[in-house]
Amino acid sequence: MTSDSAETTPLRDSSETARWQDYFQLMKPRVMSLVVFTGLTGLLAARAPIHPVLAAIAVLCIAVGAGASGALNMWYDADIDQKMRRTRGRPVPAGKIKGEEAASLGVVLSLLSVMFLGFAVNWLAAGLLAFTIVFYAVVYTMWLKRWTAQNIVIGGLAGALPPAIGWAAATGSAPLNAWLMVAIIFFWTPPHFWALSLYVTTDYAKAGVPMLPVVKGARETRKQILLYSLILFPICLSPVLTGLGGPIYLAVSGLGGLVFLLLAWRVFASKAGDAADPRVADRALYDVTEDEKAAGAKAARNLFAFSILYLFALFAALLGEAVTGVRPLELLK
C-alpha cells in the first residue's frame, strides 16, 4: 500500500461516517426517540400478550415511520430552516444532503414502515401509522405550519398518536385508555412549544412562520400557555380513573402536574417574549427592563425544559407499572 492510499483511506472512512450521520440527523433522532418511547409505552401499557418479535417489529416500524416523517419535514422546510439560527445547520439547508434525496428517503421509509407493520403485525396499527405520517408531513408541514397560529395545536395530533399505534399493535384495537395517552401528549404540546417560541420569536418571525407569539403576541401566548396547562392537569390525572395508571403514576402526575402549573404561572406572570414581539414597532410600549427580559426568558426556558421531563416521567411511570405488574387503581370501577 502506498503512503497516499494509506492517507486517503481514513479520510474516505471519515467522510462516509459523516454522511451516515447526516442521514441520521435527517430523521430527527430526538423526536424519533420520544415517539419510540411513547409508542413502546402504549404497546406495553395495553398489558396484552404479544410475541416479543412482533413487539420489536412494531417498535421498529414506529421508529422508521417517525424518521420518515422527519426526513419529509426537513425536505419541505429547507427554505424556512435556512433562515432560522436554530435550524440552519440541519442537513438539507446546510447543503449536506440534497432536497430530493431527503424526499426520496422519506417516501421510501414511509411505505416500508407502514407495509411491514401491516403485514407483520396488524393493519389497524399500520393505518394509524400511515395517518400519522401523512398528517405530519403533509397537513402540518405543508399547510398548518405556514398558514395558522394554531399550527402546533392541530398539528400536535401527529406527535400524540404513537401510544395508540403501540396499543393497536398489541391488541388490534384502540380503546379509551389508548386515546387518553394521546390526549396527554396532545394537550402537552402547546405549552411545551409555545414556551420555546417565546424565546426564539425573532427566529420564527424572520422565517415567516406564524407561531402564536408572532401573530398574537407574547401576552396572548402566555395566557394560552396557562390555559392549556390548566386543561392538561386533569387529563394527566385521568388514567388513574380508567384503569390505566396506578399509584406510582398518580404520584408522578399529581406532583409533576403541580410543578408544571407553577412554572406555567410564572411564565404567565412574567414578561417573557415582550421585548421580541414583532408586532410592535415601538418597544417602549412594553416597558421591559433587561432584568425583566432575562427573568421572562428564564421562566420560559424552565417550563420548556420541565415539560420534557414531565412527559417522560408520566410515560415512564405507565411503562414501569406495566412491566412490573403494578395494579392500576381503577377508581371509577
Swiss-Prot record:
GO MF annotations, alphabetized: protoheme IX farnesyltransferase activity
Listed EC numbers: 2.5.1.141
Matches recorded under Gene3D superfamilies: UbiA prenyltransferase (1.10.357.140)
GO BP terms in the entry: heme O biosynthetic process
Pathway in which this enzyme or protein is active: Porphyrin-containing compound metabolism; heme O biosynthesis; heme O from protoheme: step 1/1
Subcellular location: Cell inner membrane
Reactions that this protein is recorded to catalyse: heme b + (2E,6E)-farnesyl diphosphate + H2O = Fe(II)-heme o + diphosphate
GO cellular component: plasma membrane
PANTHER family named among the record's database cross-references: 4-HYDROXYBENZOATE SOLANESYLTRANSFERASE, PROTOHEME IX FARNESYLTRANSFERASE, MITOCHONDRIAL
Functional summary from the UniProt entry: Converts heme B (protoheme IX) to heme O by substitution of the vinyl group on carbon 2 of heme B porphyrin ring with a hydroxyethyl farnesyl side group.
Family membership noted in the UniProt record: Belongs to the UbiA prenyltransferase family. Protoheme IX farnesyltransferase subfamily.
Miscellaneous comment as given in the Swiss-Prot or TrEMBL entry: Carbon 2 of the heme B porphyrin ring is defined according to the Fischer nomenclature.
Record's protein name: Protoheme IX farnesyltransferase
Biological source species: Caulobacter vibrioides (strain ATCC 19089 / CIP 103742 / CB 15)
